[in-house]
């Protein structure tokens, strides 16, 4: 979940400049009209700004909704507390692997659950992660320094690693993100990060599992999803796409949101707040317009499709697999699915909370069609109780 930082930067800068072709769509007109069927409780929309940390913001948003679902007081949690701990653990593994590990701002949902289980969590009010003279998150300099530091350690110029390298590395994290709080007061009670996690949130990290759907591994088994940002090697349960779609659909009906890993590099992903998979080959038009349509650039086809919405592609398991195998689907972005809606033609959508601030037509939310979700979902993280008993039995989930 790394490439999306370029688009997030554009959003932070008010869309100055053209990035990833999305800004060419400035005059897109949206002909879709939505009726929301269900919207589950969430905290406010936040922004990752100019940092590639969507994995932390989206996971934290998901867990904030879980806290509400579990009957605890709503609280905004600190994504950068997770980032500090993840950077620390990733550094240790990077050095252990002699530099043969993906290192950068990106991460995965599993990182957040691992960090909370091991280091707890704190409210956003206790840890902003802004300790470097900026009002917004911008991690380019930090990431470059950390990578250069670790590469110098891995070169091992003294022929033996010192006992100081990790202390020095953590000092850089403290300088940029701030020292982690050891104790803090929240609503009149003193907590440590671990006691806050265990006493105030109602969360149990072990209750959350990752689901995916690809054919290069057997269904109803688990495997580490082969994406660069899965540095921690977390396993996902593999099920057919129709079952995964059914779980997501029923989860919302039953009051469960989920963290959603996807790829937003498709032409059908619009910064206006839409994610669709247009079937340009079968777009209905007058015969006289066909020749013009065939030669039209995709960006213009997309604009026309949005003005006069047509059909979407029919997605199947093979299409998903081919897109993953040929790098058309990559670990691009993490978001938080929080509801369901239909358009004026009866087509279904998930309501998705993003972490780019209150941008676009829907103020930080977007509508992702079921076709898009079916095609571009890498994995989801969800509470195990949202999974039907028959599927849990197949997966041997207790």
Map each language-model feature to its residues.
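Short, positively charged
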Residues: 24-31, 312-315
């Amino acid at each position: 979940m790394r490439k999306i930082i370029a688009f997030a930067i554009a959003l932070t800068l008010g869309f100055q400049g053209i990035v990833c072709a999305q800004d060419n769509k400035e005059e897109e007109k949206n002909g879709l009209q939505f009726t929301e069927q269900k919207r589950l409780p969430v905290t406010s929309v936040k922004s990752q700004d100019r940092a590639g940390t969507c994995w932390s913001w989206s996971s934290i948003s998901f867990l904030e909704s879980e806290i509400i679902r579990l009957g605890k007081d709503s609280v905004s949690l600190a994504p950068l507390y997770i980032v500090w701990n993840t950077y620390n653990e990733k550094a240790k593994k990077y050095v252990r692997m002699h530099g043969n590990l993906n290192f950068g701002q990106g991460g995965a949902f599993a990182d957040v659950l691992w960090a909370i289980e091991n280091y707890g969590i704190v409210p956003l009010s206790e840890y902003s992660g802004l300790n470097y003279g900026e009002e917004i998150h911008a991690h380019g300099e930090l990431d470059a320094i950390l990578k250069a530091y670790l590469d110098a350690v891995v070169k091992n110029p003294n022929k033996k690693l010192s006992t100081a390298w990790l202390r020095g590395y953590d000092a850089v994290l403290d300088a940029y993100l701030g020292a982690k709080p050891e104790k803090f007061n929240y609503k009149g009670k003193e907590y440590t990060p671990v006691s806050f996690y265990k006493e105030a949130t109602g969360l149990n990290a072990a209750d959350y599992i990752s689901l995916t759907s690809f054919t290069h591994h057997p269904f109803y088994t688990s495997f580490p999803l082969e994406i660069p940002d899965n540095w921690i090697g977390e396993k996902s349960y593999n099920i057919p796409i129709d079952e995964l779609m059914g779980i997501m659909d029923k989860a919302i009906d039953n009051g469960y949101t989920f963290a959603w890993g996807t790829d937003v590099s498709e032409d059908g992903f619009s910064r206006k707040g839409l994610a669709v998979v247009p079937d340009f080959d079968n777009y209905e038009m007058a015969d006289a317009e066909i020749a013009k349509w065939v030669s039209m650039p995709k960006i213009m086809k997309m604009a026309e499709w949005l003005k006069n919405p047509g059909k979407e592609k029919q997605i199947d398991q093979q299409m998903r697999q081919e897109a993953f195998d040929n790098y058309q689907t990559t670990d691009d972005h993490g978001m938080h699915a929080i509801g369901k809606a239909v358009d004026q033609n009866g087509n279904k959508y998930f309501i998705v909370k993003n972490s780019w601030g209150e941008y676009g037509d829907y103020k930080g939310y977007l509508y992702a069609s079921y076709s898009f979700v079916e095609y571009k979902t890498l994995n989801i993280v969800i509470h195990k109780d949202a999974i039907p008993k028959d599927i849990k039995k197949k997966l041997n989930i207790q």
